[in-house]
């Protein structure tokens, strides 16, 4: 069976991106799980490898289709020389980051690989689809993101809350193989107000009508403070800080963001760390979140395959419904009625 192909952006060239990538694939464990395809610069990779005294081997390729299994592959999408100035923000590093992101984006759209993982420092686009913050304790989805707090209430409608609950439910079932997942929906206000009563509650009730187990709305402070989050498979927060801040407080080195596009297929994961310029070139970067992102996307892809296969040909109905006979034979219904009257 062909291994899953993972497209990887190289992060900020003056940060810890290449350190994390080279360390992660220094041992064969991840190479046995997937075929990594880094969009970047072999010369910059060699610079970091030498500076950090690492022994990771990689293969330089020009196109993702040339990627070899059991090897770290680097697509040479940056042809020009890139000066590495560890720990510094520079225009060259900014440009190299953009080139890598754009090349990986094109590769993902062209299906040259199965999923994308970003190195620390790269920002994923969350404009469309569902983004979930994941650690070993919980999963938090955001109703709104990248908008000012003053505009949040304008984006909270009953239709949007209903849609996000349904998206999260589908994601938990298909991506994480959870049967009947429990979803907690957070309130917008610390005390129940108009939004909770007229917008969020009706959306939760509609979810129940659609056989989705959603509860709430819960005030965020008491919900996280009482550790109620431990009893739910997923949480829907109304805005960025409401979900992100408690998640960061509760999380540790395993934290990642997972984004599933609206098409239900395009998948991107990223560790939550930034470029970590302060420790660039010192060999102190932690690879746990990056590795967790790799593990997560491979698990999700396999779960999706199993889920889609199971739901493609559902089991036939194992009982006989007399009502179906009545619909086909209207005289049968009259006969049943006569027998009951006797």
Give the ranges of each region predicted by the language model.
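Anion-binding alpha/beta catalytic cores of soluble intermediary-metabolism enzymes, centered on
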Residues: 1-342
